[in-house]
């Protein structure tokens, strides 16, 4: 009976160590699984006045952007870019063609600033987010 309890204590001890290791070191290092965090980190490096995003409307991104973000469709994002002096638009890859067409209709010259890739685990799909400003 004592050996059984001793074995259970070892199992519990090593399970705790395993979970602490996984949740403290392994999961946070898998940046690909946290695209909103990647986006937030990239935004800190950029100079812009206002921000809009189309196609990637995740609550985590709104939270990390402290609510200073406009969720839009591709046409609204192009208009937003045209109306601002130093605005930034984030476009999810599946919305890119529509965004480019809308921008073209407004005679906007786009400059791609960044591109990040990640996995949107809430929807179970790979994503690509492109950062755009108006070319000067």
Regions found by a protein language model. Name each.
Residues 1-136:
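Membrane-embedded architecture of ER/inner-membrane glycosylation machinery
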């Amino acid at each position: 009976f004592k050996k059984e309890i001793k074995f259970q204590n070892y199992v519990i001890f090593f399970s705790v160590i395993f979970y602490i290791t996984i949740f403290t070191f392994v999961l946070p290092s898998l940046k690909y699984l946290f695209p909103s965090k990647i986006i937030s980190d990239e935004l800190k490096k950029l100079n812009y006045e206002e921000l809009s995003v189309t196609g990637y409307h995740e609550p985590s991104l709104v939270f990390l952007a402290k609510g200073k973000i406009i969720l839009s469709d591709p046409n609204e994002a192009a208009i937003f870019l045209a109306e601002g002096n130093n605005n930034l638009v984030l476009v999810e890859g599946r919305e890119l063609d529509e965004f480019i067409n809308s921008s073209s209709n407004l005679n906007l010259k786009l400059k791609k600033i960044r591109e990040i890739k990640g996995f949107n685990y809430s929807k179970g799909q790979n994503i690509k987010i492109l950062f755009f400003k108006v070319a000067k």
